[in-house]
């Protein structure tokens, strides 16, 4: 079923266009530094904010009703509809890559065996869509932070059965990565850290975390599929302190445990700010050590101490880092747009920057953006960019 019949594919129309559903500055066919923009910038659409987000937050329930979630049937039926809607959005935007957590795409069922079966069925559908559209899997990951079993971590948990369950999720995730041709595999240790040092053996926990990563590497080698492993950095939230605090901390960990030749870093703007750094600092640290793997582009709120995934609002902040599109959440206060709430996914990506008056760049500013992109390319500072809506 199609959900966006009334929206044509988004094309580049230049800065003077009045069409809100058009790119004004991103021209995928324009050559910059010997390659097209599309070749230089591997934009990826993320499954979670784009398709599964319902507007719930820690203080309230869902505010959004997605058309693909309202048509009845089983949880698997809904999962298949989500795949169709997702690839339709990606095609409309011209995005060539995508990313997902395992629980984003398939229901977990009542057992690990049932979860595996659901993942197999849905990834068959994903593979069909990949072949049909040419869209590729940039990275996938296992959600090892939402279920209550992971409240004290996975690899750093004091319960062996929790460690084992998480390892089983990663095992399946690597098999799915091979099946779908994934280029990277991500670890975000949202609960790999501590609430208090009074009951924490930090050295032991980091030993266990390193062992977990080595097991993942060994298994990837055993199935002849060794993607680039990425650690997504975040200093806190939900834990008081997380072991992937920032680029320097993660690099020290990787070097200590002989993991640095297998891992690179996934840098997110908002997470850098939470660590007390600028995004530029984290990018430069990763680049200096040859560990810049992927970018989640967004911004936070300097006055808040938690992750907000907001749209960038200043031209200089966008151009300095080479941001083009951004890792952002739908607003809880945006339950609908016209009659289809699903249109928000497209409209936020294309129109929100217009509301913030970022697209009305002068010719000089346009040239500055291109010069900065060339500088970033020469410094090796452009890599995979994650676009989540």
Curated annotation (Swiss-Prot):
GO CC, alphabetical: cytoplasm
Keyword Phosphoprotein among UniProt keywords: no
Signal peptide: none
Keywords for this protein: Carbohydrate metabolism, Cytoplasm, Isomerase, Magnesium, Metal-binding, Xylose metabolism
GO MF terms held by the record: magnesium ion binding; xylose isomerase activity
Cofactor: Mg(2+)
InterPro entries: Xyl_isomerase-like_sf, Xyl_isomerase-like_TIM-brl, Xylose_isom_bac, Xylose_isomerase
Compartments (UniProt record): Cytoplasm
Gene3D superfamilies: Divalent-metal-dependent TIM barrel enzymes
Residues annotated as binding Mg(2+) 1: 232, 268, 296
Active site: 101, 104
Keyword Zinc: no
Cofactor note: Binds 2 magnesium ions per subunit.
E.C. number: 5.3.1.5
Catalytic activity: alpha-D-xylose = alpha-D-xylulofuranose
Spans through the membrane: none
Pfam families (alphabetical): AP_endonuc_2
Gene Ontology BP annotations: D-xylose metabolic process
Main localization of the protein described in the UniProt heading: cytoplasm
Protein residues bound to Mg(2+) 2: 268, 271, 307, 309
Subunit structure: Homotetramer.
Similarity comment: Belongs to the xylose isomerase family.
Alphabetical list of PANTHER family matching this protein: PTHR48408, XYLOSE ISOMERASE (PTHR48408:SF1)
NCBIfam families the UniProt entry points to: PRK05474.1 (NF003998), xylose_isom_A (TIGR02630)
Protein name: Xylose isomerase
Gene that encodes the chain: xylA
